[in-house]
Amino acid sequence: TLRILRSHIFNWLVWPDFSSIPDRHNPFLCFQEMRVDEVAKLGRGRFMKALPALHTVPAVAYQLSGEGGSLVFSGDTAYSEPLIAAINDIPDLRYLLVETAFPDALHDLALASRHLCPSLLALFLERIKSNPEVWITHLKPSRARTTLEEIAGYCGRFSPKALHNGLELTL
């Protein structure tokens, strides 16, 4: 995966190679491959853990933890029992950032592309035992209003909201 990112994304054609800026000895960005359940210490009592996700290409979710609790960011994922189980194993979950890429009118596309739509998100959230703040990512701008209205209708217990610029979540 790192080879693919370097070859196709961070290649000075699509994006700069941030692992060599300002130089290779003091880079802005360091890449570290992580396998599911692997933990990386971030310093000051914080850590990041890779969680299982389900998508058309290999994918993971991440648990970020600090003194004030934990956050899970799913990235692209379909309904996933292993991810739900991993989330339910987090005793101090405060925030869940989860994608909902399509409205229910595109349910079949969501299934085929291994994304969530509001009804699939509702099934996912029904299985979550804790009560984190839920923030929705990956909304399609032309369908965001419809998708959020559908989410509100299905997922009232959590009152999910759209993730937005400027939001600060503290752990």
Regions found by a protein language model. Name each.
Residues T1-V72, A78-S80, A85-N88, R127-V134, ...:
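Binuclear metal-dependent hydrolase catalytic cores
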Residues I4, D104-L109:
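A short acidic, helix-capping loop that chelates divalent metal ions and anchors anionic groups
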Residues L93-A101:
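Non-cysteine beta-strand/loop elements that form the S-adenosyl-L-methionine
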Residues H55, V98, A112-H115, H138:
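Histidine-centered active-site/metal-ligand motif
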Residues H107-A112, L148-A152:
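Histidine/acidic-residue-rich catalytic or RNA/ligand-binding cores of hydrolases
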Residues L121-R127:
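Histidine-anchored nucleotide/phosphate-binding helix
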Residues F102-D104, R143:
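Feature marks short, surface-exposed loop/turn motifs that line or immediately flank catalytic pockets
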